[in-house]
From Swiss-Prot:
This is Enoyl-[acyl-carrier-protein] reductase [NADH] FabI. The gene is fabI. Its EC number is 1.3.1.9. Pfam families: adh_short_C2 (PF13561). The active site is at residues 146, 156. It comes from Buchnera aphidicola subsp. Baizongia pistaciae (strain Bp). The lineage of its organism: Bacteria, Pseudomonadati, Pseudomonadota, Gammaproteobacteria, Enterobacterales. InterPro entries: Enoyl-ACP_Rdtase_NADH, NAD(P)-bd_dom_sf, SDR_fam.
Amino acid sequence: MGFLEEKKILVTGISNKYSIAFGIAKALHKQNATLAFSYHTDRLKNKVYELAKELGVKIVIPCDVSDDNSIKRLFFNISKKWITFDGFIHSIAFAPKNQLSGDYVSSITRLDFSNVLDVSSYSFVGMAKACRSILKKGSSLLTLSYIGSKKVVPNYNVMGIAKASLESNVRYMASCMGLNGIRVNAISSSPIKTLSSYHIKNFKKILNHTTSRSLNNNLTTVEDVGNTAAFLCSDLSKGITGQIIYVDGGFNITAMSNSE
């Protein structure tokens, strides 16, 4: 019997079998959670259905988080299947490729800035707002961040601003929803090799630097993030809310590695 037995959790942001969201889904499934998946576009539909079948997931629903009505439909459909549920994984971020390289000030536009923060940050609180009435007491809401929210990472640019906004969202949401027994946290992991990560210019250089500066000199894996997410979705972590949990081998505290 897993420690997520009888928990019903929605996982968003799955795009392929290598995605962090699917790694989290596998960890939740391993602990016997009942899952639902959402997907963004029809282009992803068949792939997400395949991955859902792999884990025995019965509920797969489209959702465009830039559209409030689409978010409302997502949770209306969830409520028809589950009535109430125990939380969701927000693994959603977006930035045009041209915003992930070069000079931040020169390349940024008002439209891109607005769209990136809307999809990458507002969507988290927008989803919470839409499903608040059907969340059980003791539910857990979890999102994914990165150290680029606090420190400058070359080429991360507007995504750093979006992640800073997202982390502030976590704190204010935790404050608002705590009286309902709902916890809100984020995982901030090291860079992980996924298809989307390679949109960031010089990603391999960032990856190698992070690994060399980590205290254990190891790459952070999707499994590392998934196991932490499973814990944060469980009652084992009921005393943790409003936190940014680092899963980065200690990189965030390191000014200089032992090998330097």
